[in-house]
């Protein structure tokens, strides 16, 4: 799994 792929699939945003 590439870093770009991971970032694209998982978006981490603060609550």
Curated annotation (Swiss-Prot):
This protein is involved in the attenuation mechanism for the control of the expression of the his operon structural genes. Keywords: Amino-acid biosynthesis, Histidine biosynthesis, Leader peptide. The keyword Amino-acid biosynthesis applies. Coiled coil: none annotated. Belongs to the HisL family. The lineage of its organism: Bacteria, Pseudomonadati, Pseudomonadota, Gammaproteobacteria, Enterobacterales. GO terms for biological process: L-histidine biosynthetic process. It holds the Pfam family His_leader. InterPro entries: His_leader. This is his operon leader peptide.
